[in-house]
Regions:
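A conserved beta-strand-loop-helix scaffold within acyl/acetyltransferase catalytic domains
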Residues: 58-116
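A short beta-loop-alpha structural element at the N-terminal edge
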Residues: 34-49
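Conserved active-site tyrosine of GNAT-family acetyltransferases
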Residues: 1-2, 6, 155-156, 160-161
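Acyl-donor-binding surface of acyltransferase catalytic domains
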Residues: 1-33, 167-172
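Conserved acetyl-CoA-binding loop-helix of GNAT-fold acetyltransferases
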Residues: 117-119, 123-136, 140, 148
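Conserved beta-strand-loop-alpha-helix junction that forms the acyl-donor binding cleft
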Residues: 144-156, 162, 167-173
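Extended non-membrane alpha-helical scaffolds
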Residues: 85, 135, 164-168
């Protein structure tokens, strides 16, 4: 490849796969936590703040018009099905975890992106709960397998298995 002008990049992607007909979707409820699908119009700010905290950003989530417009654009993606975007709420109705999965009925697979939990609710099984609920809903719609770009033990503990690994090369012109 080097002779053809390609340079190896440090970036790689690891793809994990889970066959949805091989998993048990029944999880014990977690006291004080309820699940529901995201209401895109009503929950824009709550969703943005959850992502901000869930991905370990410092300080308050920016709520300026440009940021919120980008959030609206993301949540208006053509194949976004709100039923497949599951949030966990605490007793105060605050979002504490989120899982988005993407499924198009012209395919047989589900793509997981993203999954996050705010720091004070981590290691309680909530991320697993929102992921499994989202995957169950996608399975009910016809999804057969699921993919995630990750090498995290979190996904492996649920049953995701190694599918593929990619190394990126850039063409040096």
């Amino acid at each position: 490849m080097k002779d053809n002008g390609f340079l190896k990049n440090e970036q790689t992607e690891n793809i994990l796969e889970l066959k949805l007909d091989e998993i048990n979707f029944n999880l014990e409820p977690i006291n004080g936590i309820t699940l529901e699908n995201i209401d895109i119009k009503k929950d824009l700010y709550k969703h943005h703040e959850l992502l901000w905290k869930g991905f370990n950003h410092e300080g308050q989530a920016p709520l300026d018009e440009d940021t919120i417009n980008k959030q609206k654009l993301m949540l208006s993606a053509p194949h976004l099905n709100p039923l497949l975007h599951v949030v966990a709420k605490n007793k105060c109705n605050e979002y504490v975890a989120y899982c988005g999965v993407w499924f198009n009925d012209k395919t047989d697979y589900v793509y997981v992106e993203p999954v996050c939990t705010i720091p004070e609710y981590r290691n309680k099984g909530i991320a697993r709960m929102v992921l499994m609920e989202a995957l169950k809903r996608a399975y009910d719609l016809g999804g057969i397998k699921s993919y995630v770009i990750s090498d995290s033990n979190f996904y492996k503990s649920i049953g995701f298995k190694q599918h593929s690994h990619y190394t990126f090369y850039w063409h040096n012109r």
